[in-house]
């Protein structure tokens, strides 16, 4: 498994290899009291023997800040665009609010929903809106396309990772 972080130029990523983007709230450099959920996600992918690219939109040094780094949103957009699966895990809290995550979730749901997996813990803060939009968008698409569009909302990180790998394997058959 290749771990790709902000220090890796996104143009160096081989998107011909199975690629998963870990989307969700990011611990910022000014939040040293918080721990990134992505550490557990990386461990879960490793335990399941994932052998592709894992895009981790964070710095290797957790004290690093993205403040005034206007290249970071472009890096993330290119990573999201090139990935085969966008795994949204949203363990939202009052400290880890995920405002950019809200935008990304809506944008990619409208643009390429079929490559999204959506999960969040049952106790995540203020998730009702995203949950409702996820389900209502699936209903609308199902009606328009006359085909059932799945809309599971996973409630554990492990089940979200497994669903991402399942989607990735379907996509590459």
Residue ranges, per PLM feature:
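Conserved catalytic or regulatory cores that recognize and/or transform ribose-phosphate-containing ligands
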Residues: 1-173
């Amino acid at each position: 498994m290749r771990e790709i972080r902000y220090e890796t130029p996104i143009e160096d990523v081989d998107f011909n290899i199975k690629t998963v983007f870990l989307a969700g709230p990011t611990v910022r450099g000014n939040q040293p009291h918080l721990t990134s959920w992505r550490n557990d996600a990386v461990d879960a992918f490793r335990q399941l023997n994932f052998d592709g690219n894992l895009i981790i939109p964070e710095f290797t040094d957790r004290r690093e800040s993205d403040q005034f780094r206007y290249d970071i949103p472009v890096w993330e957009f290119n990573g999201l665009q090139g990935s085969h699966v966008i795994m949204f895990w949203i363990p939202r809290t009052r400290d880890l609010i995920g405002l950019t995550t809200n935008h990304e979730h809506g944008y990619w749901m409208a643009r390429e929903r079929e490559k999204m997996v959506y999960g969040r813990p049952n106790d995540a803060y203020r998730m009702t809106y995203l949950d409702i939009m996820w389900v209502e968008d699936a209903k609308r698409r199902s009606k328009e396309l006359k085909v059932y569009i799945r809309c599971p909302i996973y409630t554990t990180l492990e089940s979200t990772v497994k669903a991402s790998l399942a989607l990735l394997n379907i996509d590459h058959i």
